[in-house]
Swiss-Prot record:
Species assigned in the record: Ureaplasma parvum serovar 3 (strain ATCC 700970)
Annotated compartments: Cytoplasm
Subunit structure and binding partners: Monomer.
Disulfide bonds: none
Active site: 109
Residues the UniProt record annotates as site (Substrate discrimination): 18
Name of this chain's protein: DNA polymerase IV
Key words, A-Z: Cytoplasm, DNA damage, DNA repair, DNA replication, DNA-binding, DNA-directed DNA polymerase, Magnesium, Metal-binding, Mutator protein, Nucleotidyltransferase, Transferase
Gene name as annotated: dinB
Gene3D superfamilies xref list: 3.30.70.270, 3.40.1170.60, DNA polymerase, Y-family, little finger domain
Residue ranges occupied by any UmuC domain in the UniProt entry: 9-191
InterPro entries documented for this protein: DNA/RNA_pol_sf (IPR043502), DNA_pol_Y-fam_lit_finger_sf (IPR036775), DNA_pol_Y-fam_little_finger (IPR017961), DNA_polymerase-Y (IPR050116), DNApol_IV (IPR022880), Rev_trsase/Diguanyl_cyclase (IPR043128), UmuC (IPR001126)
Catalytic activities: DNA(n) + a 2'-deoxyribonucleoside 5'-triphosphate = DNA(n+1) + diphosphate
């Protein structure tokens, strides 16, 4: 991949993370179709199937009874969230050895800016990607897929082209053949609802979405994100990897592929968000004393709840318990479409320590 003064962005994604870790914990189920799911729920939902289960049509967010119809031999394993967190922590520690230009986006994926890093590998980006893959496999026994391009959107799409354990590189010469012919539902963060709205106005492929003659009608569907998305898909985006910037707020949210009303499943998704924002908090050497959680319903009505802490913290467990308590107060067995976590009123960790020393 030639640089030509463009950024080189890598997207790293652990393959079938929950299912793979659970499989490592239960080697007796190796080569069996397995899925992590909510065993005790009245409306049990699949959280993460392994690739063998996926070959039967089993998908994340699918009701367990339906997954069992598709794959009668499917083995359901309970969530082991503390262990997932441990694997996630070690994964990001390994990546951090390569560069501090890392943006963690969930418990099992991140972006890195490899523009300068690749120079240490004879400007051979595939050599760098292969080295990272091998180290993750040797140390954690996990496979990862890597997508490489000149912005985050296309790098993430590249990852999906060659899963599992793949390395996909999309440069300017390949984007037309590899990306523009794809269905719009392959675009990151374009959910099922927006995809259906675009289908309704006869927009099916990415090349149709970026066509100038369709701008007006697509803008009515996508609103303010339209132009940034088109810039990304055309390679015009200048968005940086978030690394050592000073934040006023650190937040992360997830729109579900399907609306959820299962407390267990929503809690699992929320746990991932909490881990993501606390990882960012620590990486930036910041602390917070104010947290908030927000949920959005299928009607697009939004509910927000905030809590002021009595002291500054960057501790995962403290933030986890505070957010969990807020969620228990605000959640009333409703169906929700999106959940988000925000850490507010951030200060540098060193400044908090200075304040504490004044009272020693």
């Amino acid at each position: 991949m030639k640089n030509n003064h463009q950024k080189i962005i890598m997207h790293l994604d652990i393959d079938a993370f929950y299912a793979t870790v659970s499989e490592l914990l239960h080697p007796e189920y190796k080569n069996f179709p397995i899925a992590v799911g909510s065993l005790n729920s009245r409306t049990g939902i699949i959280s993460s199937p392994n690739y063998l289960a996926r070959s039967y049509g089993v998908k994340a967010a699918m009701p367990i009874f339906l997954a069992k119809e598709l794959c009668p031999n499917l083995i359901i394993l309970p969530s082991e969230h503390n262990i997932y967190q441990s694997y996630s922590k070690h994964f990001f520690q390994i990546i951090n050895k390569y560069t501090n230009k890392i943006e963690i986006t969930s418990i099992d994926e991140c972006f890195i800016d490899a523009t300068d890093l690749v120079k240490k590998y004879h400007n051979n980006i595939r050599l760098l990607a292969t080295k990272i893959q091998k180290e993750i496999k040797n140390k954690l026994n996990l496979s990862i897929s890597i997508g490489i391009s000149y912005n985050k959107t296309i790098a993430k799409m590249a990852t999906e082209l060659n899963k599992p354990s793949g390395i996909s590189i999309i440069d300017e010469n390949k984007i037309i053949n590899l990306i523009y012919e794809l269905n719009i539902n392959k675009i990151p963060y374009i959910g099922e609802i927006k995809s259906q709205e675009l289908y309704a106005i006869n927009i099916f492929k990415i090349k149709e979405l970026i066509a100038t003659e369709n701008k007006q009608k697509i803008s009515l569907v996508l609103g303010s994100i339209y132009q940034n998305l088109v810039n990304d898909l055309k390679g015009l985006s200048k968005i940086k990897i978030i690394d050592e910037d000073i934040y006023k707020t650190i937040s992360h949210s997830k729109t579900f592929n399907e609306d959820l009303n299962d407390f267990y499943e929503i809690s699992n998704e929320m746990n991932d968000l909490i881990l993501t924002v606390t990882n960012r908090l620590k990486k930036c050497n910041l602390m917070t004393n104010n947290i908030s959680i927000y949920i959005k319903y299928p009607s697009f009505k939004t509910k927000i709840k905030q809590k002021q802490l009595t002291y500054y913290t960057d501790d995962y467990q403290t933030i986890f318990l505070a957010i969990k308590n807020l969620f228990k107060i605000m959640y009333k067995d409703e169906t929700i479409r999106l959940i988000g976590i925000s850490l507010n009123k951030l200060v540098k960790k060193e400044n908090v320590k200075k304040q504490l020393f004044l009272f020693d």
